[in-house]
């Protein structure tokens, strides 16, 4: 059977130094373990074709579909603050682009498809565990309503990869509105190739910000637009307790999507200094640091764009600084608006931010679970019964003091308790991809070739705001012996 991909490839029309043409490396015995049928249909693909052996071969990189022009993209990046002038797709191949049913151009990339000219002595492969982690978490983020790359398919290769021990190999088919990163701009800026920076900026404007084309100062507007999307994205992360774990500039998408999940994790007990990533030794990318790091990354983007702002360097710097100054205000506005919604506040008052901070302080002191605290507050807002929330706090004294202030604040809101409860439940999920659940899924798949736990967790996370009483245990935090203290990149 022929598997049809309606490719329309634009990135390969850019100069040859933007990428390396490279085909995926064939694998021994590809087997499809998960296809995202709704996403396939959204992309204009036929799920029935993709579920055939021929489809599995394409999704594993064993064969290249008609119309594909496989490439590895060039980029640089700051990794934990240290600049690396050449990174690039070291284990991923962009097959091409399709225009989805909403008219949006989307990349289709194979991750773990073999070595490329950018592999830096790596084998270009992916182990099954990291593939399942990214599939679960990226699709959970999409269900939560957070901009993200998507997962179209996961395939085991029939081969082993070696990461200290032998592990099953796998390939993830990742979908993104593009894979252009801050580090892509840095790649050309580091080479003082201003014309390439301009070509890339024009491409990004045409693809992601078409309203800016033809404006008087399109490159200034591009920087401002990327800043706005990143400010909103980071606010979204913090509102669900998400920790990216490796916020390097090469993992910062100019489209405003979450990308490169690696050692990501969701908080259980609230701790603003929480770090899970095993490689984040000094807490650079800790939960509460994420807005500051996003601002740092955007400053690196601004540096790349400065030559496009005009010949007066001092004036260009001032204009870039003005744009960057907008990040803090936009992040704060998005974050505080989100916190008001999470607390059931429909109007804005001066004391709202201190009220939210007081709850976080009480949660940190008493090690209360982040997700369950807000979910149970949603129900308490309807019933008035705070006991289910109190039970989450080792010492509820701080919570009791806060709850009295919260109830006073709710008293001046116009909504009924039932309206408030319904609104809060739409923004306070019951289910997140908890770390111990993900680890259990990976263990079952890697050790026993058992994907039933993966399927069940994925199904639960597809409806994060629903109660799902028959799956209530998935909402619970880990027992002490189940806690995951570190996550790993897997590369």
Curated annotation (Swiss-Prot):
Region (Disordered): 466-491
Coiled coil: none
Catalytic function, reaction form: L-seryl-[protein] + ATP = 3-O-(5'-adenylyl)-L-seryl-[protein] + diphosphate; L-threonyl-[protein] + ATP = 3-O-(5'-adenylyl)-L-threonyl-[protein] + diphosphate; L-tyrosyl-[protein] + ATP = O-(5'-adenylyl)-L-tyrosyl-[protein] + diphosphate; L-histidyl-[protein] + UTP = N(tele)-(5'-uridylyl)-L-histidyl-[protein] + diphosphate
Binding of ATP, residues: 88, 90-91, 111, 123-124, 174, 181, 260
HAMAP family: YdiU_SelO
Similarity comment: Belongs to the SELO family.
Protein known as: Protein nucleotidyltransferase YdiU
Organism: Bradyrhizobium sp. (strain ORS 278)
Gene designation: ydiU
């Amino acid at each position: 059977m022929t598997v049809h991909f309606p490719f329309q490839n634009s990135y390969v029309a850019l100069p040859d130094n933007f990428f390396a043409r490279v085909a995926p490396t064939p694998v021994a015995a590809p087997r499809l373990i998960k296809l995202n049928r709704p996403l396939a249909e959204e992309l204009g693909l036929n799920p029935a074709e993709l579920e055939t052996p021929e489809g599995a071969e394409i999704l594993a990189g064993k064969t290249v579909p008609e119309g594909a022009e496989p490439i590895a993209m060039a980029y640089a990046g700051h990794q934990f603050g240290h600049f690396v002038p050449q990174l690039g797709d070291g284990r991923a191949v962009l097959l091409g682009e399709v225009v989805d049913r909403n008219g949006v151009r989307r990349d289709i990339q194979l991750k773990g498809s073999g070595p490329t000219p950018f592999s830096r002595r790596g084998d270009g492969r992916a182990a099954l565990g990291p593939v399942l982690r990214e599939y679960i978490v990226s699709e959970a983020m999409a269900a939560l309503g957070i901009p993200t790359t998507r997962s179209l398919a996961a395939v085991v290769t029939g081969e082993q990869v070696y990461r200290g021990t032998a592990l099953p190999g796998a390939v993830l088919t990742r979908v993104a509105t593009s894979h252009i990163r801050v580090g892509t701009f840095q790649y050309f800026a580091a080479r003082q190739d201003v014309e390439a920076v301009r070509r890339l900026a024009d491409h990004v404007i045409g693809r992601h910000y078409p309203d800016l084309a033809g404006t008087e100062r399109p490159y200034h507007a591009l920087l401002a637009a990327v800043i706005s999307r990143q400010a909103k994205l980071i606010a979204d992360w913090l509102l669900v307790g998400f920790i990216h774990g490796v916020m390097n500039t090469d993992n910062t998408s100019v489209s405003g999507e979450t990308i490169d999940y690696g050692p990501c994790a969701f908080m259980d007990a609230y701790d603003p200094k929480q770090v899970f990533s095993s490689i984040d030794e000094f807490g650079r990318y800790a939960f509460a640091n994420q807005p500051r790091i996003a601002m740092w990354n955007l400053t690196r983007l601004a540096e790349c764009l400065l030559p496009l702002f005009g010949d007066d360097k001092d004036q260009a710097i001032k204009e870039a600084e003005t744009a960057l100054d907008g990040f803090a205000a936009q992040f704060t506005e998005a974050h505080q608006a989100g916190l008001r919604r999470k607390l059931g506040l429909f109007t804005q008052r001066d004391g709202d931010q201190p009220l939210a901070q007081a709850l976080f302080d009480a949660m940190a002191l008493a090690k209360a679970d982040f997700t369950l605290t807000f979910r149970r507050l949603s129900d308490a807002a309807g019933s008035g019964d705070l006991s289910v929330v109190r039970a989450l706090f080792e010492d509820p004294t701080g919570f009791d003091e806060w709850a009295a202030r919260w109830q006073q604040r709710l008293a001046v809101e116009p909504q009924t308790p039932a309206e408030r409860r319904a609104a809060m439940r739409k923004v306070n999920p019951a289910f997140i991809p908890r770390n111990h659940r993900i680890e259990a899924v990976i263990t079952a798949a890697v050790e026993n070739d058992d994907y039933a736990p993966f399927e069940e967790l994925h199904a639960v996370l597809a409806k994060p705001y629903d109660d799902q009483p028959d799956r209530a245990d998935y909402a619970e935090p880990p027992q002490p012996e189940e806690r995951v203290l570190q996550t790993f990149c897997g590369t």
